[in-house]
Each structure stands twice: as C-alpha cells, then as structure tokens.
C-alpha cells in the first residue's frame, strides 16, 4: 500500500504524496541528523541528540521549512514536494525514494519533470539539496523558482519567554555564489559557544533575495508569502529567512538544476556544486551502508524476514543511536542508551565506549544513575527524577561491551562523578552501580529493590516516593546484574569479596519467588507505599492484572524455575490480542489507585501509550528474550514478526497508518484509532529486534571468554545460514536441525549459561 520496499537495501519507494500520516526517514552521519518525510526536510540537528537545531517544523506543522515554489507562466503555483499549494493538482509518476545514501523526490506535471535530491556526506554538518526541472513538453517553459528556508539555529528547547532569533546575526553576501550566514550568539556571554551556519546557493539566473522573514511574508504566511524582496544584507534580533528568486526559461528537452548547501562548516561547501564531486561523495556514502549491511547476514528461508533483518534493523539501529528517543532536548535516557548500545555492539563497538564513559561521568557517587543524562556529559542538563532502573540496565551493557570487545583496559580509565570532581576507575563506577541496589536503605521489607520514583515502566512513578515501595523487575534485573559483575571481577582477578555478590543474587531470587509469585501463578509487578501489590492477582481496584515484564524477566534472569515456565507462557497468552501482546491487561485508571503513578490515577486514558496497549519494547521485546530461554522457537519467531512492521497480516498499513518499514513504539487501541502505530523509531524495540534475531533466535552471545551459541528456532527452519563478525573476524554459522556448525566445523563443546542455567554450545576464543 502506497509503495514498496526496494531490494537489496534499506530503501522504500512511495508513489503518492497523499499518505495518511508523515512517513519519516532518517539521515545521519554522527555530525548531523536530518529527518525527512514525503513533504521534504522535517528537522536537522547538529551532533545529535545534544546540539542545536539547524531548522525544524513546529508541532502540527505539516510542510517543510525548506522547499521550493515554482510559478508557471500561467501563474500556477506548486512546490518541489507538490504541496502546500494548489491541492487540485494531480501529478503523474510520483516517485519518492528513501535510500540510505539519499532521498529522491520526483513527479511530472504540465509537461515538466521535477526532481529533488537530498544528501548528507559521510562527515560534517552539511546538507546538500539539488533541484532539477526537465521540460518534457513541446513548448518553452518560463518559470519563477523561489527557494526558501527558515533557519532556527538554537537549542531545541528554549525558555517559553525566549526567542531563537534574538541570538541570530544574519548576513548575505553575493559573489560567485550567494551566501547567507547566521551567527548564533551566546545568551550567557560565552564567546566560545558561538556558532555560524552557512546557506550557499547559485547566482546564475538569480533575480532577488531576502533575509527578513517578516518582510518576506508580508501579509501572507510561510506557505503563501507575499515574497517581498528588499535585498537587505544584514538582519539581527529578528527572524531570518533564506529566500531567493530565479527566473528559468526551458526549451523542450532542456533541464536546469539548482544546488543549495546548508552547513555549519563553510569548508568545501562549493565542491558540491560540481556534479562529478557530488556523485563521487554519494558513491562513498553508499559504500558505508553496504559495509553496514554486510556485517551480519542471515538466511532462514523466510525471504521477507531475512530482508528486513539484514537491512532495516541495522539501519534503524544507526538512527536510534543518534535519535535516542527522539526528543531533541540534549539528553539521553540511561536505560535507553544502555539497551540501544547493547544492540549496536553487533555493528558499532567504538561508539559504545564513548557512551559508557559519558554515562559514568553523569553517575552519582553513591552509584545511582539518572533517568536522563546530558548528551554533552557531566556539565549539561540532566533529568534527575528518582527512577532506579538505569544502573541495572547499565551493568548489562558493561558486561556485553566487554564481551564484544575484550576492551578490559576501559576498566582502568578514570572519570568523575556527577556530584564530585574526584576521579575513580570505571571498575569502581561499575561496582558502585551494583552496590547501590544492595545497600540496606535501598532494600525493602520483602528483601526486594526499592522502586523510588520508578523502574522501566515510567508511568508507575509514585509507587515508592515515600521509600517503602519495591520493584519486582529491578530486583530480577539485579539477580542478573550481580552475576554480570561477579563474572567481570573474576575475569580481571579482582582481589575483593566477589562471593557476596553471588550470595545476594541468590537472596534476591529467593525473596522474589517467596513474596512476588502470587496465588494465581504469575509474578506481581511492584509493591507500593501503601503496602499493596500492584499488577497482582487482585489489585486495589479489584482486578486481576497480569503485567508481562516482571514475568518475562523472571525467566530471563533465571529467577523462575523451569517447572514454572508453563505459567509464564499462560500469562503471555492471556495478554495476546489481534495486534500482538499487550504490556498488561486490563487498563488502569477506571478506578484510580493511590500511590502508583500517573498510569493508575485516571489521567492516562485506557489504551493510551503503555496503558494496556501492545507496547512493542516491553510487551514483545522482553517476551522474545524470555521465549528464547524457554526454548519456544515457534513462539519466539512469531513474536519477532509482531515486533517488526512489514507483515501486513499482522500490522496492515491501512490500520497502523505508519510506514511498513518503521518499527514503532506501540500499537494503540484508542477509540477511532484502533491499531494505530505511535512514534516511529523512537523506541527500544529496534534494539529488541536486533538482539531478538541474533542473540535470542540464532543464539549468538559473545561472552568474556568466547561465544555461547544456543539457537531457538522454529521447527520448520532446518537449515539457517548466518554471517557475523566477532572481534574483527568473520564467522560463518550453519544451524542444521539441532546441530551448529562454525566455519564448516560442527560445534560440540557445551557449558551452562551463567544466568539461566541452560546448556549451551561454547566456542572458546
């Protein structure tokens, strides 16, 4: 519907501008992130996700701040993305191609073919924008071409009373090229933080330009400006625009092209006006993605699944690493980073080290890690709400990083603390992260970890603010986390007491099973400050309410005994619906429950966000991981296909309204929006899909001393081939029946998985 996947790449072709929603695609090179949709550029951010926005659409704004208006000799207006002008226009041969290396837009109308191409080079905060018209008719075409870009050039979020334009000094210079430059001044008199953006365009056929947005718009608006051109050369403290006018005369079969570049660095900008240079840079960019797609390859016999896993999952992992959760506020979530980068390790280990060190300098000296930390590090703005799960996720990331890289030297590096200038080693930071959870003041009356202001489920944000509430999920995470720490310390010959961590892990496991496993044979979610269990066999509102996450983590962490797996499977089946697996059920809020949080207060409608929806990350990602432990290959494969968006029998586009290439945050059941997808790419589900394929289904798990391999595959898949990399070496795996071959040699050595006790194949490396 609306288009089709492009073979052999993470590409999609769209054949109409009239999509039911904004269908987005991301371009990023670490120096800049650009989001586009069918109507062109949406926003651009330097050094994502923590730096300034170069331009952005405001909320509910449909059309791009950077587009080109075309006026014909019949005084008819249209744009290079067709709209926002005459909506009666019916273009022909619409073709929007999202390719990893560039975005292409083309259509035909009134004897013209209009083409736009948007490109980010491999390095640098630059956006190259090329627009071409070809006269495919039989008569001359006399056209006015009016490009316009409204720059923003400021932090994504500023004070409500503040204005971005107060800090901009914009100039225009005309030479071989016309160059607009906007200098961002510092509101805090820090001259070192000044920035300058450059917008460069051609001068051939140029007839007018304008830098004052106010004067350019006149009595109109941004979509229909008066287009007054005063030819002023400077404006400051008022909003700028980069507006130009060209006059083109095209004979039949003649084409004309306009190149524009928007950049934070004026070096080599004009090189992109040379098409040979541009094509070369585009080819270089394509090679980068070809290498990305070749790092891990699977061949299962399910061609649609293989295509999506081989191209779209690694592509979106790259995006997520730069988007974080897509709120361009300059912060990253601790739990979000930990989960995303644990999956990114399969394709990009170097970025993970930088993230780890940044996270640790934002760690409090008692071991606690913030809900969100500044992407720029310790001295930035942080979200210091009292959620307690960040460190639990971080410990697993640290173990996985060491397993994927063997970079044990990182443990000796030193970094400061959020609340102290003292420096300690990474290993000390890691130990304190774990010991935070086992300190007496952070253990509740049932011997479980206290929940404070929240765990993974953000909307349970008032269950423990008085200091009594406990989290079952965090306790289960620490059953694992304590073992991860012990494994690391054993590996580096740590001379301190390691046994105490393993003992406490067993103690937590015992307490969870004693107090949180209820008479209905599933695990409760949390214990609140009122002394009541929530997500239990009988909640305070009278409902039996199964919450998947603590049940799945009971299996993942090795807390649940294997004889109780049948109860976890039954609980999951009770959460299943026609959209996948719900996070919990029934919804909260009809009868408000005190001391739980916003999700149970009546302020979050049923089936909104996490509230009893198919919340992809926790509903299906954690379930997939648990199913791999339980050896449920058929169910695991089905759940992975529920996470992914391409299968029209599971997530029909006519219902979700989101693109079939985009992994979403959740599928909602709100009245009038049944099965509607919410927030493309802004989710930990992408990381769950990556790990789901390679770590949980194919069972490839790097460890501190080698590879554990424990496939969990459907019964009908009897010959799977895998190409992967580990420690910069390529490995070829074949899974035939229940046998595993590595580089054509059958793997026979086994050992016990230290977390869940399963027997697994082992390849010492």
For each predicted feature, which ranges?
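Catalytic cores of carbohydrate-active enzymes
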Residues: 146-148, 163, 370-371, 477-599, ...
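C-terminal capping/lid segments that line or modulate ligand- or cofactor-binding pockets
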Residues: 2-5, 11, 18-41, 329-332, ...
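Polysaccharide-binding surfaces and accessory modules of carbohydrate-active proteins
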Residues: 105, 119-227, 274-291, 295
